[in-house]
Amino acid sequence: MWIRVLTNSDVLTGDVLSFDSASQKWIKASTLVSPLGVARTDATLKTSSITEYVVEMVMQGQVLAKASRDIPNEGGELNVENGAVYVDNAADHEGIIVPNILDASARVAGDLVTVLIR
């Protein structure tokens, strides 16, 4: 399931988002904060607007998120930096990066990787 939220024009599919109370928009997350969501589409202009952008955002379940670092084949605990995910097995929170598919190529920074948000 997804919801449509206000965002910035530079948000792309797979960006990890958090709510910014100053702008009242969902922007690229700089750290692991709760709640968080993942953009399932690129930002587009809001209907009947020339200045406001919206994005479809997933907050729970399986979704593709952008990797900020290379992701090990075994996956691991999810952490966030610069609007993207990486493995941090010292983290304790609501998400994981799933293991790589058998015989698939290595997942590198910038790739979309499957994450589970609880």
In which residue ranges do the predicted regions lie?
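Surface-exposed, low-hydrophobicity beta-strand/loop segments enriched in small/polar/acidic residues
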Residues: 1-118
